[in-house]
């Protein structure tokens, strides 16, 4: 993936009229969506507690449309400002949606032993996105407003669940 991303970015930099968004760990308010980051980590047997930049689609997709209409160009780290750890996300899920939910942690070293490919953990620069849309919420506030509050109202829950051991 990162090799392809780099190649595409090298090609696109030659064009002046391109607007490219880099999403990271996309989250939407459909907690039963298998492509949703929350669904994924809630169904892992164990999670690594590391902070990352993330994209709350319900908030940011309208800004993508706005950016196109405003004819913005360039590459944007299309993530909510700040970073949040996996444990913080799961704690919000537990607090708002599933009080009996539990999870286990393991270390990066333990994770590396079971993964086919290494994972990257990043807090991406948010200066450019905050300049274009200063009203964008930080990641935690966005998760609460666009994902957890609506699911608290509707009773939304992740389907499935981790069954194994770390």
Q: Over which residues does each language-model region extend?
A:
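NAD(P)-dependent short-chain dehydrogenase/reductase
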Residues: 10-59
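Active-site His/Glu-centered metal-binding helix of metallohydrolases
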Residues: 7
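Active-site helix of classical SDR
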Residues: 4
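Short, amphipathic alpha-helical "lid/cap" segments that border enzyme active or binding sites
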Residues: 38, 57-65, 136, 140-147
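Mid/C-terminal beta-alpha module of Rossmann-like enzyme folds, strongest
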Residues: 63-121, 147, 158
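Short glycine/proline-enriched coil/turn segments at helix->beta-strand junctions
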Residues: 13-18, 42-46, 69-73, 95-99, ...
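C-terminal amphipathic/interface module of NAD(P)-dependent oxidoreductases
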Residues: 115-166
